[in-house]
Amino acid sequence: MKKIILLLATTLISTAHIHAQKLTVHTIGDSTMADYVENTTRTRGWGEMLQEFFTSDVRIINYARGGRSSRSFTEEGLWDKVKSNLNPGDYVFIQFAHNDEKEQGKDGADGRGTAPWTTYKTFLEQYVDETEALGANPVFITPIVRRYFTKAGTISPKGCHDIGI
């Protein structure tokens, strides 16, 4: 009987500990999501403001960096930093495409451009697979369109990375 009570108490304490933990959201992406130093620029990435929409029970960690693509975020080691901080149950918000369109949407020499249906897709799959392998939850965020317009004033897509997902 003592063993059953001990097992039950251990289970309840473990469960209470799990529910007491904060929910953590890690954001990865480019300048449209990145943090900026206040008072030095009027620019703000949406990831910088995300915490304002949640209670203190949710913690936002923004890893997004200006100029990064799905390729450069990995190749510069930023993704490794995120993975080292992931815990089971965490969320990873993934938004790339803005800089993946560099080099006319091809695998570029600058280390940023990716082809929409090959390398771009491969990097996105990597983020999903590695996030899930660590017990976390990947969430794709629709890329923000670039400010390219036709003469008629409609949005003119320069790449296909928004549909490459």
Language-model regions: role of each:
Residues 34-44, 64-73, 106-116:
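Acidic/histidine-rich helix-loop elements
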